[in-house]
Amino acid sequence: MNLAIGPMTAIVPTLFGIPIDFLLFAAILLGVALFHHHTLRVALIGLAVIVAYKLLVTGFKSGPGFNGLVGHMRQEWVMLTNLFLLLVGFGLLSRHFEKSRIPAVLPRILPHDWKGAFWLLVIVFVLSSFLDNIAAALIGGAMAHTLFRAKVHIGYLAAIVAASNAGGSGSVVGDTTTTMMWIDGVSPLDVLHAYAGAGVALLVCGIPAAIQQQRHSPILKHEHEYVHVDWPRVGIVVFILAAAIAVNVIINVLFPESSDSFPFIGASVASAVLVTAVVRRPDWEIVPEAIKGSIFLLSLVLCATLMPVERLPGASWQTALGLGFVSAVFDNIPLTALALKQGGYDWGALAYAVGFGGSMIWFGSSAGVALSNSYPEAKSVVLWLRHGWHVTVAYVVGFSALMIIAGWYPNAPHKTGIRAAAIVDTRAMALDRDVNLTHVAA
């Protein structure tokens, strides 16, 4: 074990050259991946261990001991509160959309052959651009259950998850990872080009998956009875999204100095949900479960904010590509938090990588876990990889297309002080590599 010190940094114990912080963080993510029925407990225990380690050994960047912890929470509370309110609020928004009965109308437009299965994936892709990707995947799974007489191929389930993650990758309201970027100050336009890769990936995995499904169980064209769309609920969905976007634009354009002082975006969504409750009652019954899921994700995000990101590999397209494969095994939420803290990424490329990359294994994304709860047969890594092979191929092809079409253009730091901090951190990392002040037995 080595103990190294860099300028303006706390002591950073390492094991085999890797900071202990990262080993603890990796252990948490591995525990989440292995113990799917105890994810909240694993995340909270892991957070407690990392906080205790920081308190007793390394201290925080804002200082040692409890004062350092309080200082760190003062820096992060706005981001965490925003994320919590958006996760719960978008969960209620998704239920409004489902109850609008639009999902029951959409299958009417589908062709009778394999192209119908493909266009269903396109619908999921589009829904995910403005709904939470979890909701889009569940809606797609429900429509597939009806259209294919409950005989849904595992390869097609993988494609539904991939379509939902691809559709959310270029939209700041379509995926938790891109929403985190938005909250952190990244412009929505800086993630939009993720669709250059996501669109190609949808074609590459969607067509083989649709053919798989048609051979497994042909599409059943229903002559549905007349479905009455609840347009007031549709209006509520539009109003909530518009409120979030408008408040974010106003704060970041007119009052950028105040953006870190209050959770404006989250508060706008919560207010819009409450105001529109007089028009249609929200599905309050989902709130307890949404809060539980939000606490789990916030625990992982908070763990990520405690990591010494100055010791991570520099941001590059190779790193982003690798993070996509890592996100297939480890939750992409904390990976995104690490990248945001580090800075210097092409956010569109990163959004595509950690979003679509999580589709390669069923537990690599929240959408995959949610859909697999409805289709337990999908909870097999071997079967998912065997029948969903096209998702992995699509990820690589899509990323390549993104690099060819849009290129790699790292965004300038989106927060004041990040540039200077990055310079200091780089110098600290260089010094830490060259100088070990103390050597103790591992």
Can you say where each PLM-predicted feature lies in the sequence?
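Juxtamembrane and boundary regions of transmembrane helices in multi-pass small-molecule transporters
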Residues: 93, 99-102, 150-154, 158, ...
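Membrane-interfacial loop-to-helix junctions in multi-pass transporters
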Residues: 16-22, 79-83, 109-122, 148-158, ...
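Hydrophobic transmembrane alpha-helices that form the pore/transport pathway of multi-pass ion
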Residues: 116-169, 180-184, 337-352, 377-380, ...
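Short helix-coil transition sites and intra-membrane helix breaks within transmembrane domains
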Residues: 36-39, 93-101, 127-139, 167-175, ...
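Hydrophobic transmembrane alpha-helices of multi-pass solute/ion transporters
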Residues: 7-114, 254-314
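Transmembrane helical segments that form the transport core of multi-pass membrane transport proteins
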Residues: 240-345, 422-439
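Low-complexity, proline/glycine-enriched hydrophobic segments characteristic of transmembrane helices
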Residues: 1-8, 60-71, 312-313, 408-442
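Alpha-helical transmembrane segments
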Residues: 76-89, 190-206, 264-265, 347-360
